[in-house]
A protein has these predicted regions:
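Outer-membrane beta-barrel pore domains
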Residues: 82-192
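Outer-membrane beta-barrel channels and translocator barrels
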Residues: 28-32, 68-70, 147-150, 189-191
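Surface-exposed coil loops of outer-membrane beta-barrel proteins
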Residues: 1-64, 71-82, 101-129
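Short beta-strand-to-coil "C-cap" segments at the C-terminal boundary of structured domains/repeats
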Residues: 65-66, 184
Length: 192
């Protein structure tokens, strides 16, 4: 791996390790329409949470067009020294209604956005309290390419959080965040 952990770098946008089910596959292999797809339904509360805080679930989908070559492995470098250029272009989206505005990889995954004054679920609060307080919609556009040790990746994210309570919070009722990352690296196979 040549790059910092993505869930650290794009912390505000990660939906990290949700509990649920998904269907994935590849259609039209090695044709101009070669695509990978993933669709899923999740609890929407993060690591280790099997149940949602209300009756709403998280829905997520990703569609990847393998424009040149095969799908690129989920890695942050071209450690295989790929002999044939590969280029993937993808879009993804997720929607969720819960008391979480962000997630992290630990046992208390459900949390509020860093730096916001959105209300956070109090420790020991009764199950269902503040249930479905936030509506979160987000999307990502991604481009990845590998060729002879060279790895390129670009992600562009947008996330909209709507506070569905009627209280006046210092943080706006609706907030929209944009972010992204670009990575370019080379894995030095000849040195190893």
């Amino acid at each position: 791996q040549q790059f910092v952990n993505r869930s650290i770098l794009n912390d505000v946008f990660t939906i990290d390790r949700q509990q649920g089910g998904q269907l994935m596959g590849r259609l039209f292999d090695n044709s101009p329409a070669d695509i990978n797809y993933v669709v899923g339904v999740f609890a929407g509360r993060g690591v280790g949470e099997r149940l949602n805080d209300d009756t709403n679930l998280m829905y997520a989908a990703r569609l990847q067009w393998n424009t040149i070559g095969d799908p690129i492995d989920f890695t942050q470098s071209d450690y295989k020294f790929t002999q044939r250029l590969q280029l993937n272009i993808a879009v993804g989206a997720a929607t969720n209604k819960s008391n979480c505005t962000a997630f992290e990889t630990d046992s208390t995954s459900c949390r509020r956005l860093p730096g916001s004054s959105y209300p956070q679920l109090a420790a020991g609060a009764a199950p269902g309290s503040q249930a479905g307080l936030f509506k979160v919609d987000q999307a990502v556009f991604e481009v990845r390419s590998v060729y002879k040790g060279l790895y390129f990746k670009h992600e562009a994210h947008v996330k909209r959080v709507t506070d569905q309570s009627v209280t006046n919070n210092a943080w706006p009722r609706e907030a929209e965040m944009w972010g992204g990352l670009v990575q370019l690296g080379y894995f030095p196979h000849s040195v190893l």
